[in-house]
């Protein structure tokens, strides 16, 4: 791809690193780079500082139609919908529309393993990366992780495995470009981002882009516990392409087409495969005693990563070593501290009800739940029922989704004590500390997005951690 001298426009600088990586990459390739973002400079200070000294023009606090008419290539932030009127202007003027990931896929010389899913994708991505690094120490892990993939390109050779976390927003762009990873893995599918996709069907179609453009023989790793993914397997694909995994539910993986599968049988994680001679092999990868991650949902994440690693040819002993060493991911059921007999857990990454339900099911102790926030057009009925069964109290944060959650709690006839909604996070945490009894858990697992009170869910989790650590 020739970029030297091209008029390149980066739409959306952002604060997670992707926009910075794109702008830096384009500038170093000799493109004439303009970065445009609706946010003012003060909101983007860290990103602007990271680009200091590079020949980049910034248009902040607005988008200008003239910039889109003059651009030869527009690289959009995944949060920008493909239907944006500014992108329509650029297309009409003949500009190529790209994203960081479409550029990366076109330029990456190494094999790409992609992971997506409503929940579990970050844990699975990082665990899969750890498994591959046991055998290939130069493995690169990037994607939807606040790590720019383009920044990693100089260190990637034809033999360097690359593990990427891919959101539904990113997959939309990859689908438009006809790009899919060598190995595709979908951890879970449940309602999410319906404010963007509109319908569950459209959301599923976006997730399916991860395998839609694979080559014959490329593996796709699917969850046997998911009726949606079992239905995906009906499409016309060679049976050898299907690799299955199952969590602790004990799904009947043997009835599904395809010879390869990773599943829990009692306390053992089994890899089932067919040799080139046609014989069936069963290998014990690890046991539950090897697992440090909490929660039944993480057993499924381990099985998913194992299935993808085995499909890539990683030896069982390397997988086992990675499982034993892997202690978890920041902002996902992250233990913050214990104070006065109360445990504080940061699960801010639970931005959808399904993820928060999984968090509630992880613990046996009574829970003081901190929930609520911005709406993503998702139902809260199941979340409310789970709260009614497992929480001793719920502390609500202010946001557009919180009235819906309140209505769902009333409909569930939940007898749980309800506090809030709070528009002051410190006040909400002071209440949590006051009402939590020794032996209980204060769990930040909102089931909602963070916008309004926070810049993003990571800001919410960082603030939770800071306030809790300040308690004396």
UniProtKB/Swiss-Prot annotation:
It is found in: Cytoplasm. ATP binds at residues 117-123. Pfam families: Mur_ligase_C, Mur_ligase_M, MurD-like_N. It catalyses: UDP-N-acetyl-alpha-D-muramoyl-L-alanine + D-glutamate + ATP = UDP-N-acetyl-alpha-D-muramoyl-L-alanyl-D-glutamate + ADP + phosphate + H(+). Its main location: cytoplasm. Belongs to the MurCDEF family. SUPFAM superfamilies: MurCD N-terminal domain, MurD-like peptide ligases, catalytic domain, MurD-like peptide ligases, peptide-binding domain. One of its GO terms (biological process) is cell division. InterPro entries: Mur-like_cat_sf (IPR036565), Mur_ligase_C (IPR004101), Mur_ligase_C_dom_sf (IPR036615), Mur_ligase_cen (IPR013221), MurD (IPR005762). This is UDP-N-acetylmuramoylalanine--D-glutamate ligase. The lineage of its organism: Bacteria, Bacillati, Chloroflexota, Chloroflexia, Chloroflexales. Its EC number is 6.3.2.9. One of its GO terms (molecular function) is ATP binding. NCBIfam families: murD (TIGR01087). It is an enzyme of class 6 (ligase). The gene is murD. Cell wall formation. Catalyzes the addition of glutamate to the nucleotide precursor UDP-N-acetylmuramoyl-L-alanine (UMA). HAMAP family: MurD. GO terms for cellular component: cytoplasm. Pathway: Cell wall biogenesis; peptidoglycan biosynthesis. The keyword Transferase does not apply. Keywords: ATP-binding, Cell cycle, Cell division, Cell shape, Cell wall biogenesis/degradation, Cytoplasm, Ligase, Nucleotide-binding, Peptidoglycan synthesis.
